């Protein structure tokens, strides 16, 4: 059995590529890296990689992580500017005994020394988004922070090896240097090949308060199906944050166990995810949730899929 699951519709092309690789007995590590890179390289996905939305100083700062479920080794980078594929940099850090999590200039120096591709990641399209949002904030006192759609994945190969990886440009209009949950082991991602893995998307500052990805893996280790584990972890922590703070940020989690069974839970409307297994072609699901945290899925319609791409590739006009 093999399988791969990812946050958001934007992962579909990458998941399709990984599905083909896994069918050909390629590793979970190589398959998930290629899947994440496909998202990083597509400029119309504005929360990851090339074309990612900038911080408040109009700089694109990228975060990424990679974890091996066999060894529990991980590599992470944060606040990286002008490198094409931060997930590949993160993967390369995984095998060191120390210095596995590098940020800012330190991460960039490491990437340069090790020959990773430099690339100007701020696109003209992202500049238009920035200028339009700046004007909206000035005119209407809108909250600047929005757009925190991390691509996160969990992968299982034919040999039972599991991996997890994430990549994001973080909150739109974030303070320079801000890091969310995406590169933080246990919060944005976690995987154990003896159990399974999970990955998060949403408001990182809140996801980190509960180490929600690790919590889902812990619940699976206790015997819960991935769907039960996701629903319990997300709903319980959503309630806990509201009890303590009166509010909870966006949280959506995906998971897969070492049998290829999968699950998803969210506290928002409009969440989508993609899954492929040995017995299921790459499929986009839309998620609905009730007040008790129970989630139901429906396959995205052709109309929904067409509208998704049309919206993201539509021409932009500077206001």
Which positions does each model-derived feature cover?
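Alpha/propeptide regions of enzymes that mature by internal proteolysis
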Residues: 1-319
């Amino acid at each position: 059995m093999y399988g791969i699951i990812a946050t958001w519709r934007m992962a579909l092309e990458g998941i399709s590529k990984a599905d083909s690789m896994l069918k050909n007995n390629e590793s979970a590590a190589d398959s998930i890296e290629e899947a994440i890179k496909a998202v990083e390289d597509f400029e119309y996905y504005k929360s990851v990689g090339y074309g990612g939305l900038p911080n408040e100083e109009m700089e694109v700062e990228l975060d990424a992580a990679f974890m091996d479920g066999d060894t529990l080794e991980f590599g992470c980078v944060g606040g990286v500017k002008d490198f094409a594929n931060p997930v590949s940099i993160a993967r390369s850090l995984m095998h060191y005994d120390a210095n596995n999590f590098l940020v800012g200039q330190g991460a960039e120096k490491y990437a340069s020394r090790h020959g990773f591709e430099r690339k100007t990641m701020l696109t003209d399209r992202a500049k238009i988004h920035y200028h339009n949002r700046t004007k909206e904030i000035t005119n209407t006192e809108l909250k600047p922070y929005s757009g925190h759609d991390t691509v996160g994945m969990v992968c299982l190969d034919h040999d039972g090896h599991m991996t997890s990886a994430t990549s994001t440009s973080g909150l739109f209009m974030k303070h320079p240097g801000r890091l969310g949950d995406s590169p933080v082991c246990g919060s944005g991602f976690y995987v154990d090949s003896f159990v399974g893995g999970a990955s998060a998307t949403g408001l990182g500052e809140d996801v980190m308060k509960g180490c929600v990805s690790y919590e889902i893996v812990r619940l699976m280790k206790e015997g819960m199906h991935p769907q039960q584990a996701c629903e319990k972890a997300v709903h319980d922590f959503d309630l806990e944050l509201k009890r303590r703070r009166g509010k909870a940020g966006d949280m959506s989690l995906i998971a897969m166990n070492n049998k290829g069974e999968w699950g998803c839970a969210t506290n928002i409307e409009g969440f989508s995810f993609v899954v492929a297994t040995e017995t299921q072609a790459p499929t986009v699901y839309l998620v609905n949730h009730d007040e008790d945290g129970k989630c139901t899925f429906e396959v995205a319609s052709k109309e929904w899929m067409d509208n998704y791409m049309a919206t993201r590739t539509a021409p932009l006009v500077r206001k």
